Amino acid sequence: MERKVFSKDGQELRTIDLDDGVFNIDVSYGSIYNAINNELANLRVGTASTKTRAEVRGSSKKPWKQKGTGRARVGTRRNPVWVGGGIALGPKPRDYSYKLPKKVKRLAFKSVLSLCASVDDRLKVVENFTIDSGKTKELALIIKNFIKHNGRTVILLGNDDQMIKRAGKNIRDLKILSFNRLRVVDLFYTKNLIALESAINGLNELYVK
């Protein structure tokens, strides 16, 4: 599968081969769904915590005698029914993370890359560049040449270029990611995917096996 390579000014330069096994497979929406759920679960902190009737402050003495007062029977002021009492069945700190099978993860990445490249043409391949000044304005002018849809934009780098990342910090709805540190959720929800040549070559090597 061939794709046009553009200069940072938006001019056509040449073509690049996208491996069909990475960028042109039948999209598995099930694997994408499982991968996104896994990524979001792994991000959860899981620190929500409430006190049970055993942990809440208060006396365990019976407020009044069992019978003869006309009031409802109560055993303790820490009763979950009472204001200030313990919480019944409330959340406790827990780890929500879990492992996803490697084959499912790989299939999810290939599927979402194919979705971007083949199905709705979100992918634009751009020659390698850097932002020596680290200025936001310079990067914003480059991005403007390739934005096809309003919304989230992802730039894929072939390396960890700190100057490009610095330039993109103040641009709304923009994420700058290295090709080997991707998340399916970022690619699935992006409207525009701008990939540097080095990132495409890296993805071809990483997922072609």
Curated annotation (Swiss-Prot):
Which Gene Ontology MF annotations are present?
rRNA binding; structural constituent of ribosome
Q: Does the keyword Transmembrane apply?
A: no
Q: Which GO terms describe its biological process?
A: translation
Instruction: Kindly indicate where the leader peptide sits in this chain.
Output: none
Which InterPro entries does the UniProt record give?
Answer: Ribosomal_uL4 (IPR002136), Ribosomal_uL4-like (IPR013005), Ribosomal_uL4_dom_sf (IPR023574)
Record-level GO cellular component terms:
ribonucleoprotein complex; ribosome
The regions listed as transmembrane in this protein's record are: none
Q: Which UniProt keywords apply?
A: Ribonucleoprotein, Ribosomal protein, RNA-binding, rRNA-binding
Q: Known PANTHER family for this protein?
A: 50S RIBOSOMAL PROTEIN L4, LARGE RIBOSOMAL SUBUNIT PROTEIN UL4M
Q: Which NCBIfam families match?
A: rplD_bact
On assembly, the entry states: Part of the 50S ribosomal subunit.
Q: Which family does it belong to?
A: Belongs to the universal ribosomal protein uL4 family.
Purpose of the protein: One of the primary rRNA binding proteins, this protein initially binds near the 5'-end of the 23S rRNA. It is important during the early stages of 50S assembly. It makes multiple contacts with different domains of the 23S rRNA in the assembled 50S subunit and ribosome.
**This protein's name:** Large ribosomal subunit protein uL4
